[in-house]
């Protein structure tokens, strides 16, 4: 890239490189001058990240527990109907059972008794 054609771009690039080098130099100088302090600060930073991850995991588990303690749908939703050749997903089976096999579906009272026993 020619500096005569785009002096602004080359100036911007050189300024950016200078800032980058001075920042790296300052960081290296600080680490060399205060190795103990730098190690302590890095250790604290790593511990904070670990604590943050643990808090996030605990919070996520509590959120999952709250979802599991929410009111559940009636037990008839989970009961498996006895079918000899069952190869369909639940929604197909529900539709078929609602018309042809009403006698096999227990009432809510019977299901509540089964759940409590």
Curated annotation (Swiss-Prot):
The chain crosses the membrane at residues 39-59. It is found in: Virion membrane; Host endoplasmic reticulum membrane. Signal peptide: none annotated. It is a single-pass membrane protein. Its main location: virion. Induction: Expressed in the late phase of the viral replicative cycle. GO terms for biological process: symbiont-mediated suppression of host innate immune response. Keywords: Glycoprotein, Host endoplasmic reticulum, Host membrane, Host-virus interaction, Inhibition of host innate immune response by virus, Membrane, Transmembrane, Transmembrane helix, Viral immunoevasion, Virion. Glycans are attached at residues 12, 97. GO terms for cellular component: host cell endoplasmic reticulum membrane; membrane; virion membrane. Together with the penton and the other minor capsid proteins (M1249L, p49), forms a complicated network immediately below the outer capsid shell, stabilizing the whole capsid. Three copies of p17 encircle each p72 capsomer in the inner capsid shell, anchoring p72 capsomers on the inner membrane. Required for the assembly of the capsid and icosahedral morphogenesis. Additionally, inhibits the host cGAS-STING pathway through its interaction with STING1 and subsequent interference of the recruitment of downstream components TBK1 and IKBKE. Interacts with the minor capsid protein M1249L and with the hexon capsid protein p72 capsomers; these interactions form a rigid zipper structure that stabilizes the capsomers. Interacts with host STING1. This is Minor capsid protein p17.
């Amino acid at each position: 890239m020619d500096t005569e054609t785009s002096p602004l771009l080359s100036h911007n690039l050189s300024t950016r490189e200078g800032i980058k080098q001075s920042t790296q130099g300052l960081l290296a100088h600080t680490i060399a001058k205060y190795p103990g302090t730098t190690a302590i600060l890095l250790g604290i930073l790593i511990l904070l990240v670990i604590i943050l991850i643990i808090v996030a995991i605990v919070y996520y588990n509590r959120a999952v527990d709250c979802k599991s303690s929410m009111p559940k749908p009636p037990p008839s939703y989970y009961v498996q109907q006895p079918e000899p050749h069952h190869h369909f997903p639940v929604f197909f089976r529900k539709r078929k059972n609602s018309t042809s096999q009403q006698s096999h579906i227990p009432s809510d009272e019977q299901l509540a008794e089964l759940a409590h026993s």
